[in-house]
Structures are given as structure tokens and as C-alpha cells.
Amino acid sequence: MSPQTETKTSVGFKAGVKDYKLTYYTPDYETKATDILAAFRVTPQPGVPPEEAGAAVAAESSTGTWTTVWTDGLTSLDRYKGRCYHIERVFGEKDQYIAYVAYPLDLFEEGSVTNMFTSIVGNVFGFKALRALRLEDLRIPAAYTKTFQGPPHGIQVERDKLNKYGRPLLGCTIKPKLGLSAKNYGRAVYECLRGGLDFTKDDENVNSQPFMRWRDRFLFCAEAIYKSQAETGEIKGHYLNATAGTCEEMLRRAYFAKELGVPIIMHDYLTGGFTANTSLAHFCRENGLLLHIHRAMHAVIDRQKNHGIHFRVLAKALRLSGGDHIHAGTVVGKLEGEREITLGFVDLLRDNFVEKDRSRGIYFTQDWVSLPGVLPVASGGIHVWHMPALTDIFGDDSVLQFGGGTLGHPWGNAPGAVANRVALEACVQARNEGLDLAQDGNSIIRQASKWSPELAAACEVWKEIQFNFKSVDTLDLNEIK
């Protein structure tokens, strides 16, 4: 009889409740290369030892339940159970611990982020013995990574499709996000693309509302793309949001975008769901479409430091599920994002191999085994004065996306796009000539504005706009060197 089906008659069955740590806390366990490893921030209820709390997480997210069951004897728990193998105290926080859990790979369906998350971040997050629980990081083993398609195309293929190299890409979210007619929306797209942007974008909640149905928007945006391409000689795109109420409708919209010949579409991957997102990513690879991903709803999940899921985990999940771009914060704009933490998950999106680095919040070494990379998108409250910092922080393999920072230009949409393109080209040239963007950024922008009236006007409008608020999600004291 195989170990998987062996009946433990010699052990016998004893009903009742026993401590989780007797079965699921195994500090001597040596992790395997095929294990999925998780780092949980655990805040136990008063009186619950950290070992019991960590073991409870391992049990409730794998094979365990609240009482002993006789069917445990029909399988091999040692083969399938999750194990809490290490616990460390979080310095500077009262009664808070990092619990490390190892999961055997056989617990998870191949190629399914949905199944992986249903286990690891499922019912355990409502467990009464814990005051709070947060998933800080995951190590995805190479054996599991290879079961995913990942991004439809990846960074290098996108650059080849667009024929654009050596600089960040420029984008703009059309504003107001709701209320424009399809024709006026298309006009704004055309003006921004003609002015020098690479992309424009539907906002995350632009789907198919009474004021602008999706098919009309797609048609007017396609017209804007082709007209601006003819006038500028550059390849242009607009992120056509295919997110819909059903997967069937989502794919119908994606197919229509393909028929129009546009280069890129968009999906809200958290509100749309991982199953829908993975399906769309497969469609995009099969049909040559790039896929832009918006992270609407992420802050509900990731912003609180003691409960939820850290965005670095959501970013890893997106790379598995599939997307060529994803919003990743700005560090300098209006949205949450501490610099070292942001750079940590930006590397996890782009790079093929990332070493463990607790100073950037990275708990595990991650090998993506040639899974294509994802371009991080900096978006939210940014303008021309931020361009040097953004170019310095995110580097060439990124998308810098200015909504109000384009459409809020006093002379209109096209001049706003011109201002952003001039500022970017000036920063890239200065960097290539050896200047320090962090130190010389303002002088670079001022110098460029002398021969660009559009940039000069933008500099004047936004010279005093700042968002000086402390990040909620910060590094722990024991992570800061």
C-alpha cells in the first residue's frame, strides 16, 4: 500500500482537540527546493504562545482543522501538511512575530494562482486565535513557476513591438475618469499621443457605462491611435480596459480590440479576479496583445501593516497570472509607497533572480526561471518636477504615467504631453552624460524649460505641489541596517 493511502491502524484514533504545535510546529524541518515558503506577520491573541499561533497558521492553511478527525488515518499528513519551521520576534512591535511556513508542492494545482491563494490566504485570516495576520512574502519554487505562462510577452518583446529603447515609456490616464462621451474621450487620447506620449489609458473604473459604451470608446480610441501614429511616425497605444462583469464579456471585448489592430488592452486584476486575469493573459499571448494591469482594490488588502497581504506578494502573483505592466506606486507622488520597499517589489517584477534582502522587505531569494518580466508603472500625483526622481528610481524599464500632470497643463492636453516628453528626454540625456539626477534634477528641468515653453508653463503650475505624508507600510526595526 502506498504511503499516500496507508491506514494508520497501528496508531489508532483518539477523538478530541490537541494543540496545533504538537503536529505543525517543526523547528528542525529542513525546507526543500520544491516547497512554497511563506512569511506571515502573526499577532496572537493574549495568552496564545507564538509557536501555537504559527502552527495554527500552518495547519489551517493546509491539512489541519480544529479537532482530530479519523480520516487523518487515511492519508500521510507528513507528506501533505504545512509546517511552521521558524519564528522570530518583530522588534519594536508588541506581541508580533514573523512565522515561516513551508508547504509541500502537492497541495497546489498547477498553473493556478486562485488555488494557491485559496489555501494560503483563505479561512486562516479569520482565525479567532489571531488578532491579526499578514502574508509578507512567498517563495515560489522553480518547479511551480514553470507551470505558469506568466506575462503574455514581457519587457524585451514589448520594446521590440514598440521599437522604443533606452528610456522609460510615457503614459497618461485620461481625466475626468468618468463622464466624457466616447468622441471627446478619443479626442483627449489623440491630443496626448500626438504631443509625444507613448500610451494613454482608461482609468480603472471605465468599463461600459451609459455615458460611454465600451465599443464606442474602443472605436474612437483606435482612430486616435492611428491618426497620431501617422502624424508622429511613432507606435502608439491606449490601454483599452476589457474588464467586465463576466469572463465571456471580457474576452469578447479583448477580441474586438484585436480586430481593431491596437497593441494593448487592460485589466483590473484584483477586482476581476485571478482566474479571469490568467485567461486574459493567455488570450493576449495567443493574439499578440500587450496586457496592462491595474491594481484597483490593492490598498484594501495591503495597506495595513499588521493584517492582509503585502503588495510584493500580489506582485508575484500577478507575474505568475500574467501581465506586461502593473501599477507599482511612485515613491514621490500621492499614493502609498516607501522607497526601499517599492524598489524591492519592482525588482521582483522585472528581474529574473532576486536575492533575499530584508533591508528591502524581501524575505526569500526568488528565482523566476526565465518567466518574462513585468514593467512597473509609476502613476498617481506626479508631474514634471518629479521626472528626475522617477527616472532615477525606476530606470529605463518602467512606464511613467501622468494623468493630471498632463491634462492639467494650462495650455491643454497636447502641450501637457510635450512638457512631459521634453522633461523625460532631458533627464535621460543628463543621466547618460553622467549627471546625478537625484542631486541635479531641478536644474536639469529648469535648463530644459528655457527652450520648451510648454515645459516652462508646466513648471510654473506645479512648482509648489507636494505630497508630504509618511508611509503607513514601513520596514521593521530588525530589517533596517
Swiss-Prot record:
The record marks 334 as: Transition state stabilizer. The disulfide bond which can form in the large chain dimeric partners within the hexadecamer appears to be associated with oxidative stress and protein turnover. It catalyses: 2 (2R)-3-phosphoglycerate + 2 H(+) = D-ribulose 1,5-bisphosphate + CO2 + H2O; D-ribulose 1,5-bisphosphate + O2 = 2-phosphoglycolate + (2R)-3-phosphoglycerate + 2 H(+). It is found in: Plastid. One of its GO terms (biological process) is photorespiration. InterPro entries: RuBisCO, RuBisCo_large_chain_AS, RuBisCO_lsu_C, RuBisCO_lsu_C_sf, RuBisCO_lsu_fd_N, RuBisCO_lsu_N_sf, RuBisCO_lsuI. Its main location: plastid. This is Ribulose bisphosphate carboxylase large chain. It comes from Cuscuta obtusiflora (Peruvian dodder).
